[in-house]
Structures are given as structure tokens and as C-alpha cells.
Amino acid sequence: MVIATKFGIVRQAGTYERRIDNSPAYIRAACEASLQRLGVEQIDLYYCHRRDAAVPIEEVVGAMAELVRAGKVKAIGLSEVSADTLRRAHAVHPIAALQSEYSLFTREPETDVLPACRELGTAFVAYSPLGRAMLTGALDTAKLEAGDFRANNPRFQGEAAAANAALVEQLGALAREWGLTPAQLALAWMLARQPHAIPIPGTRRIARLEENLAAARWR
């Protein structure tokens, strides 16, 4: 088991307003707080969740590297950064993983981030590999609740939602030809196209977890 956690997004108590903090002092404090909450002596993978443009990436990674040298963190990662930022960060300390959204719907990382990861030996961790559930074929965008963040995402609204649903129907038809679910085909596509990518689909049910894991047999 690998324990990964993040720092960078700070929620204001009471109001839940968010701000981004990449200051070295906050990085150290957040690490100590995570160690205490998790009840461990070392974090396997420590991510910078979001970049604070006011703090140079070299300073951010330098602070993270100090935690590695102190034995509090085993490896460090970044989330949602450009290929250039990844290279600058890697020049300070090896970056074990870069997390970014990637799926059949979201292909931007193929342009330069994925090649940079291959070049540097950095694992690419793909979040929302099922397009925030759209690629499962089971999501009804008309029934999204008001508190669901997807309700405010253009991808799930109006004509875009209808167009995406039509694409998912085609995905489902192709999946059935192979005896797969739409989710399994979407994951198998990623594993075949990007062998070094690690998809992290979220789920609340064991049955869905088992369904997703079975996709690895079809890469």
C-alpha cells in the first residue's frame, strides 16, 4: 500500500473559502499535520496539489526535498503543472509523480506533459480517467444535484452534455462488442495508449472497484 497526500489548498475555517499556499513554512506545517492525522512516520508520496505562482517552483521543491532528507517523505509529486514547470522542478529534486486530469474527454496532457514525464521517468497519475463519471455510461446529467460541482461544469450542461452523451453511447456500443463496460473500455484505452500512466478512478462501491480493476486485463 502506498500512502499519498497533498498540500497547497487551504480552506478557511467556518467559511470554507479556499486559497493556495506553497510557502515553505506551510509545506512543513502541512506535512507535520498529515503525519499526525495519518498516524505514520513517513509519507510515501507527498504532492503539491496546486501551484502558488507567487512562490518559485524551485523554492517549493526545495522545501519538499528537505522533508525527504529528514525522512518524513519518501517521494514527492506535483499536480496540474506544465511540462516546463516539471522540468524546472525535476532539476531541483526527482519528481516521482505528476497528477493531472486525463481521459478520452481530456487529452491535453498528450501534447507535452506526458512526453516530459516519459523523458524524466516521472509517473503520470491520471485523475478523473472516467470523465467525472460521464464515461461510465451511467451518469444522467439532468439529475445532477445542486450541490454537485459537475452541475456548474459546461461539459455537463446543455448542448455539450447532449453531444457528450451521444459520444458515450458510441463508446458503449464498441464496449459491448468486446464484452466490456464503457468504463472498462475507457480505462483499457488509457493503459494501452500510455503504459506508464496510472489511472485513479474514484468509486464508492466494491462492485465498481472490481469492474475498474478488470480493465487492466484488456490493455
Language-model-derived ranges and their functions:
Residues A4-R18, Q42, Y47:
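N-terminal small/glycine-rich loop or linker at the start of catalytic domains
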